[in-house]
Regions:
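Short N-terminal binding/cap micro-motifs at the start of the first secondary-structure element
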Residues: 2-4
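Secondary-structure junction/capping motif
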Residues: 6, 54-58, 115-121
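Active-site phosphate/pyrophosphate- and oxyanion-stabilizing loops and adjacent acidic/basic residues
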Residues: 9
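S-adenosyl-L-methionine/SAH cofactor-binding core of RNA-modifying enzymes
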Residues: 14-85
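C-terminal folded domains that constitute the principal catalytic or ligand-binding module
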Residues: 69, 78-159
Length: 159
């Protein structure tokens, strides 16, 4: 997504190494070529995506030692689904969904799914599985600041 408040921009500041590719879901051949080129150096990338055949968080925890890359699709739910369904390569990856108990903090973002997460929130949920010492509040602090800025930009309703 190319929105100035895109949460992937915050990820670039917080994570290293991170590889971000901009995909056009309207051209399946180009989409697959870019994904193939990006993932060719990895032997067992895992996709974090709530597809119909995605495994749950417990299965993800059991796979933590066997993967060498995590793949997240950033964008609106409509765009993310389109990228997933246009890419035969992404559909072949082992995919996992994150079972969450709380709604997203990103209230400004609209989603048709009740318990959908922004990309940075999904990354944070997965990182919590890796490291017992992972401080998700510290990791998400720039995201919380971004939300605060966005809320301040919304015109106040007159009473």
């Amino acid at each position: 997504a190319k929105h100035p408040f895109n949460t992937v921009n915050i990820l670039k500041l917080n994570l290293s190494p991170i590889n971000i590719i901009d995909l056009n879901p309207d051209n399946a051949e180009t989409l697959n070529n870019v994904i193939n080129e990006t993932l060719k150096e990895y032997h067992n990338p895992l996709l974090i995506f709530p597809g119909d055949n995605s495994l749950n968080k417990k299965a993800l925890v059991n796979s933590l030692d066997s993967f060498d890359a995590l793949v997240f699709i950033d964008g609106t739910w409509k765009k993310s689904k389109k990228i997933f369904f246009q890419s035969s390569l992404l559909q072949k990856l082992n995919s996992y969904k994150i079972d969450i108990e709380n709604k997203s903090t990103y209230e400004i973002r609209k989603s048709s799914l009740e318990y959908s997460l922004s990309t940075i929130e999904a990354v944070s949920e997965v990182l919590k599985l890796f490291e017992t010492s992972f401080n998700d509040q510290e990791f998400l602090n720039p995201f919380f600041k971004m939300i605060e800025i966005q809320k301040n930009l919304i015109p106040k309703k007159r009473e």
